[in-house]
């Protein structure tokens, strides 16, 4: 999401052409060189999943009594800066339905006070700890609920990390669909356990910040993705989120296969709502609404923040235009009823009808009193900030995540952990505070002091910050600090001194440019910012023992100094949030052994990546971003091309050592067929009269006090609009548009897809023993290798599961059980449009280790298990 209100949105994207097949695959082509997203109409109704039945029944009762204006009011935002939240819908006061508050961010409540700034997703992913993923979700839910937020805009599982320089990779959990999927699902479960509605984003193909948005000058880029790649990589984590019963899905700005995501009927109607069985509501990213009728027919349910192509004028593609489209018969009444039913069913399912708080903060001002509608020329004034403290004890969870994510890349001579009486000299501005003050940059749009998070809408204010400088000083008062990015000439270096050098690499969202980087790491590349490499080299020249601490949004090139003799230890502390200092000293001084693992690959050089994942730029015309690398991103590419990385995906050392032994595999649900059993039939969905409502339902109420710019559902002359329905005028519907229901997709049947896909095919056990001299935790990472008999080019190893041990003392063991589902050992069959596996699992190999290249045990289905 972005609040850059000067961005202009393109009015509409080209309509797709019709195909004869009732179930075409994504990116079928009209010609050899033109991507194509086939039509999929009509929008499937929600309510057929049994676990949502009660919520849909309640919603049906309400929707049956709503007027046209009230229905439209719940689908349309009130306008940018027209309320306390990033966006809010209209309300239905007579039935007790409030404006629904939608607000950022995935790591904490944005632009407010007395909140927790949790570590971002990339840090959470590095823990490889499902319990911490869930606990953070609970914390996010409790805080957002406490502030009166109905929908928190997170978690983010798109971008997936296809482009290493991508600006918002740090908001997600790692560069792998399973790591993203598990991280997203656990976060959703935690968030929604509190009654908050989670909003998984960005669906889909938002892998680059530059040129993602459409304007009156140019159209946002098109991510051109083949059907198999889209299913096996980019949709995978969204399927896990839908299976976790996520309440809402945010649509991305960009096109996919030359059709805008917000009106891409194949993606929303066909994949998300029909194949994945999504029961909640679909919302735009902010100002990502490019057409009114087209998006409604394509399955969009809510428009945020409500404005049309030119914001701040009170115009909308929906609002009164949606009322008009219903009255003149362009948009079927059934479609509007389903939109509103989905929104209210989600509200009921989370229990938000029961004493749920109203917003008690304003994202527009820090003052207690302020404008209620800051975007209006004349606005009433009232209390907008009540300064409700929602932090609770969430600092404990935040510190645990930041600590358990710390990834030890190198530790020669066991220099770490440090002793409290070591002679330490600390270098780098990344160790210290922002000299201009805490939260001095809006949305973290600067890189000063320790890097706690990237920049953009996916941030929150820091309630406090203990920097590494402060934390180290509290433990070793004799440490000397040089908070500068130029190595001081006056530093004395003794043999017993240990230099700790702090460096970082930042990125963020495209509406802010920092040091020449417009969101994506365009200028900096994958290198340290602020002279970081030179600072390390200078310290390595003067000191015989150097520890490097890196705060980074993603992969970073280390080659200028990583092999220098004096660089003994390297830690990646990722993005630690508010607990940057003590989470680091917990590990540096040995109170905890590092247990984080890389959620991405660190290459020797950027040229190790395929050329297709570089940033794309052009001043005019639509950028066509072809995903020609297919399934081969990050570690999958390195394995395929036999490129040894500097540090592999999943790599992470400890202060101790672990042995993996006694692997065992058992068959749980036999894979008796190549394809899953037949999907369950759809249950009934709510039904309503489909007659066009009276025009009077969209008329302005008498003596209504309008607020200029506020988006209302009312029409000045609704009778004239209603008369059009009986005229000879017809709307130019997209090619392929139909109101005839589609046959149920064979890969569907429940939330996430055919429930048989999650049948446990194999259970794998492995015993992990601490064989070192320090307590610690190990991560067992399970990778699947599929046989050539499937007849498809498939990555040689794919992460499919992971488990983390408890803290193991020296000599202590724990047996871990990792489950492998049917889907885990399947590929997407483009022709059949279903998931295909090897009958009996014959030839499937299961690898377990501490990274993708550090495999400790191997099992072959139908064969034996061995320890390597």
From Swiss-Prot:
It catalyses: Hydrolysis of terminal, non-reducing beta-D-glucosyl residues with release of beta-D-glucose. GO terms for cellular component: extracellular region. It comes from the Eukaryota. Keywords: Carbohydrate metabolism, Cellulose degradation, Glycoprotein, Glycosidase, Hydrolase, Polysaccharide degradation, Secreted, Signal. Pathway: Glycan metabolism; cellulose degradation. The active site is at residue 285. PROSITE patterns: GLYCOSYL_HYDROL_F3. GO terms for molecular function: beta-glucosidase activity. Glycans are attached at residues 65, 73, 257, 328, 360, 395, 421, 726. The keyword tRNA processing does not apply. InterPro entries: Cellulose_deg_GH3 (IPR050288), Fn3-like (IPR026891), Glyco_hydro_3_AS (IPR019800), Glyco_hydro_3_C (IPR002772), Glyco_hydro_3_C_sf (IPR036881), Glyco_hydro_3_N (IPR001764), Glyco_hydro_3_N_sf (IPR036962), Glycoside_hydrolase_SF (IPR017853). GO terms for biological process: cellulose catabolic process; glucan catabolic process. Its EC number is 3.2.1.21. Residues 21-40, 731-752 are annotated as: Disordered. It is found in: Secreted. The keyword Signal applies. It holds the Pfam family Fn3-like. Residues 1-20 form the signal peptide. Belongs to the glycosyl hydrolase 3 family. PANTHER family: BETA-GLUCOSIDASE, BETA-GLUCOSIDASE F-RELATED. Beta-glucosidases are one of a number of cellulolytic enzymes involved in the degradation of cellulosic biomass. Catalyzes the last step releasing glucose from the inhibitory cellobiose. This is Probable beta-glucosidase F. The gene is bglF.
């Amino acid at each position: 999401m972005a609040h850059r209100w000067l961005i202009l949105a393109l009015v509409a994207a080209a309509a797709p052409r019709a195909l004869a097949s009732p179930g075409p695959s994504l990116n079928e082509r009209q010609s050899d060189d033109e991507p194509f997203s086939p039509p999929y109409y009509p929008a499937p109704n929600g309510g057929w999943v049994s676990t949502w039945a009660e919520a849909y029944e309640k919603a049906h009762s309400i929707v049956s009594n709503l007027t046209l204006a009230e229905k439209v009011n719940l689908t349309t935002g009130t306008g940018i800066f027209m309320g306390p939240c990033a966006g809010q819908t209209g309300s239905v006061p007579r039935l007790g339905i409030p404006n629904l508050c939608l607000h950022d961010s995935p790591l904490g409540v944005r632009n407010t006070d007395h909140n927790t700034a949790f570590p971002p997703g990339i840090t959470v992913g590095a823990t490889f700890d499902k319990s911490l993923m869930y606990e953070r979700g609970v914390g996010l839910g409790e805080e957002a609920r406490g502030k009166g937020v109905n929908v928190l805009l997170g978690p983010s599982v798109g971008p997936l990390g296809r482009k290493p320089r991508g600006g918002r990779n740090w908001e997600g959990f790692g560069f792998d669909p399973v790591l993203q999927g598990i991280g997203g699902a656990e976060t959703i479960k935690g968030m929604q356990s509190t009654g908050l509605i989670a909003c998984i984003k960005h669906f889909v193909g938002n892998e680059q910040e530059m040129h993602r948005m459409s304007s009156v000058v140019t159209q946002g880029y098109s991510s051109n993705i083949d059907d198999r790649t889209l299913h096996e990589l980019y949709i995978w984590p969204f399927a896990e989120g839908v299976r976790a019963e996520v309440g809402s899905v945010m649509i991305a700005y960009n096109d996919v296969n030359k059709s805008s995501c917000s009106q891409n009927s194949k993606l929303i109607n066909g994949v998300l709502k029909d194949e994945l069985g999504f029961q909640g509501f679909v919302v735009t990213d902010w100002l990502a609404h490019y057409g009114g009728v087209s998006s409604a027919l394509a399955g969009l349910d809510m428009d945020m923040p409500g404005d049309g192509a030119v914001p701040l004028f009170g115009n909308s593609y929906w609002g009164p235009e949606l009322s008009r489209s219903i009255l003149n018969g362009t948009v079927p009444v059934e479609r509007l009823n389903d939109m509103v039913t989905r929104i209210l069913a989600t509200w009921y399912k989370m229990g938000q009808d029961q004493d749920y708080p109203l917003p008690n903060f304003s994202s527009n001002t820090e003052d207690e009193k302020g404008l209620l509608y800051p975007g209006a020329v004349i606005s009433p004034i009232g209390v907008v900030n009540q300064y409700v403290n929602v932090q609770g004890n969430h600092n404990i969870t935040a510190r645990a995540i930041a600590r358990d994510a710390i990834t030890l890349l190198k530790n020669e001579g066991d220099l770490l952990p440090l002793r409290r009486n070591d002679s330490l000299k600390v270098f780098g501005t990344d160790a210290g505070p922002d000299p201009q003050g805490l939260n001095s940059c809006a949305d973290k749009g600067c890189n000063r002091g320790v890097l706690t998070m990237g920049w953009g809408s996916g941030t929150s204010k820091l309630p406090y910050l203990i920097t590494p400088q402060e934390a180290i000083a509290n433990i070793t008062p004799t440490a000397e600090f040089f908070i500068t990015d130029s190595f001081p000439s006056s530093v004395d270096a003794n043999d017993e001194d240990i230099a700790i050098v702090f460096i970082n690499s930042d990125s963020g969202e495209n509406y802010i440019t920092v040091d020449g980087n417009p969101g994506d790491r365009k200028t900096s590349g994958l290198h340290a910012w602020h002279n970081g490499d030179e600072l390390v080299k200078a310290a390595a020249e003067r000191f015989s023992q150097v520890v490097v601490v890196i705060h980074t949004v993603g992969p970073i090139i280390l080659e200028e100094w990583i092999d220098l003799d004096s660089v003994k230890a390297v830690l990646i502390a990722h993005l630690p949030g508010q607990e940057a200092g003590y989470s680091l000293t917990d590990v540096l001084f040995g109170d905890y052994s590092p247990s984080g693992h890389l959620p991405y690959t660190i290459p020797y050089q950027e040229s190790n990546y395929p050329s297709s994942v570089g940033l794309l730029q052009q001043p005019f015309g639509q950028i066509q971003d072809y995903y020609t690398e297919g399934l081969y991103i990050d570690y999958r590419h390195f394995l395929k091309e036999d490129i040894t990385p500097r540090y592999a995906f999943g790599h992470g050392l400890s202060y101790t050592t672990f042995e993996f032994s006694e692997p065992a595999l058992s068959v749980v649900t036999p894979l008796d067929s190549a394809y899953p059993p037949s999907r369950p039939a759809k249950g009934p969905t709510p039904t309503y009269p489909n007659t066009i409502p009276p025009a009077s339902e969209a008329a302005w109420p008498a003596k209504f006090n309008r607020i200029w710019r506020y988006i209302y559902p009312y029409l000045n002359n609704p009778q004239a609009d209603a008369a059009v329905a009986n005229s000879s005028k017809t709307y130019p519907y997209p090619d392929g548009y139909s109101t005839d229901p589609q046959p149920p997709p064979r890969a569907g049947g429940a939330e996430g897809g055919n429930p048989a896909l999650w049948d446990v095919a194999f259970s794998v056990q492995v015993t992990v023993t601490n064989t070192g001299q320090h307590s610690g935790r190990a991560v067992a990472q399970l990778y699947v290798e599929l046989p050539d008999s499937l007849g498809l080019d498939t990555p040689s190893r794919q992460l499919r599961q992971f488990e983390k041990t408890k803290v193991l003392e020296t000599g202590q063991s724990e047996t871990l059980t990792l489950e492998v589902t049917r889907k885990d050992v399947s590929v997407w069959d483009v022709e059949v449009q279903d998931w295909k596996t090897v009958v009996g699992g014959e030839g499937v190999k299961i690898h377990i280790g501490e990274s993708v290249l550090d495999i400790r045990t191997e099992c072959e289905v139908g064969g034996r298990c061995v320890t390597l």
